[in-house]
Amino acid sequence: MELDGNVAPQTVASFIYLARDDYWNDGGCHRLTTSGIYVLQCGDPTGTGTVTPPYGFGIENPPTDGNYPRGTLAMARSDDPNSNGGQFFLVYKDTQLPTEGGGYSIFGQVTEGMDIVDAVAQQGVDGGAGDGAPKQPISILSVDVAQKT
């Protein structure tokens, strides 16, 4: 993944902080959506979708048209626009998300590994619904941060 601190400095700083703190190590991706919205949501170290870091921050760099192209890396949040924290999502198919409430912070792009996200998405949601835990479990073993050269 490539992060863009120029457009979302607070989001990228938080992501780097959490990565260096091993926040996501051995966590999972707990949510897959397969109808209308096409994202794989990750970032809760327990894999339940209920845990966030002990802080939150506001929305940065949301698209005004609500368009999130394939490969987008964006922050997940609750209805509270200041609830960005540790959960994020990977867009695996061009997706239109509501702009009401401020949208979602785009802070990077997936540069490698979309084939893995596609494989998880192809398996669908556990139980067959359009939104829920991925049928194919996926884990984040570790996250390393490196300066782009």
Descriptions of predicted regions:
Residues 1-149:
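Cross-family detector of peptidyl-prolyl cis-trans isomerase
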